[in-house]
Every structure is written in structure tokens, then in C-alpha cells.
Amino acid sequence: MLSPKRTKFRKQHRGRMKGVSYRGNRICFGRFALQALEPAWITSGQIEAGRRTITRYARRGGKIWVRIFPDKPITMRPAETRMGSGKGSPEYWVSVIKPGRILYEMGGVSETVARAAARIAAYKMPIRTQFVTT
């Protein structure tokens, strides 16, 4: 699963997901794409699950670009731990997604195949998405 090789700081604040995505909201590499319609955190496992389904469905001949990367660490405290004694340890990585962000791009396949692959990948995502073309 995806995670940064190294970061400047081990832990981050949770932050807020206000507004829409101004960066990464256009198709750059392929002809078809899956675009987010809601704000959410998408985990590295969910990104990988979507990528696998698209590659499995598109088979050879198609190319896939993953346009998001999980660069935010999410911390968790051990179960049944009392309050206090600092912030928990990093457990997994997420990508902060705002509405309009392109998640995956596809090229080298027909629109029907790309649309079907995007629909299967959309089931793996915790948000509503839409299929877009250039």
C-alpha cells in the first residue's frame, strides 16, 4: 500500500475539508477519469483496492494513472487507554479528497470498458464519484 518514504513530522493535525479542489481537478494523462463529488479521507487501502479493480477489468492494453497519494498520517490510541499521555501513534495513511478531485485516469481502452471499470472502482470508494471524459 502507498505511504510516504519519509516525512518532516510524524504526526499531523486532522484539519478541515472546506471548499472544492482547485488542483488536480482536470484530466491530464488519460482520456477517461473517476472524479470525486464529496469531501473525504481515502485510505491507502481503498486507493489500492480501486487500482486493483481497474487494472483487473481493463486488462492489457489499458494504462492507469493514480492521481492521489496518501500523505496524511492518522493516529490512533490503544484500546481501553485513559485520556492524556499524548497523541497516539500513526496507524495508517490517508489522502485528503475535496469535491472535484480526479482519483484515477484511464487510457488505451474503449469508453464502455473504462466506464465499467470506473463503476467497479467507485464501489470501493467511501464517497460518491462520477465518470468524466476529455
Curated annotation (Swiss-Prot):
Designated gene of the protein: rpl16
Keywords, alphabetical: Chloroplast, Plastid, Ribonucleoprotein, Ribosomal protein
This protein's name: Large ribosomal subunit protein uL16c
Protein's organism: Pinus koraiensis
An MF annotation (GO) of this entry: structural constituent of ribosome
InterPro entries per record: Ribosomal_uL16, Ribosomal_uL16_bact-type, Ribosomal_uL16_CS, Ribosomal_uL16_dom, Ribosomal_uL16_sf
Gene3D superfamilies: Ribosomal protein L10e/L16
Main localization, broad class: plastid
HAMAP family assigned: Ribosomal_uL16
Key word Transmembrane helix present: no
Record's GO cellular component terms: chloroplast; mitochondrial large ribosomal subunit
NCBIfam families: rplP_bact
Places the protein is found: Plastid, Chloroplast
Quaternary data: Part of the 50S ribosomal subunit.
GO biological process, any: mitochondrial translation
Domain of life of the native organism: Eukaryota
UniProt record similarity statement: Belongs to the universal ribosomal protein uL16 family.
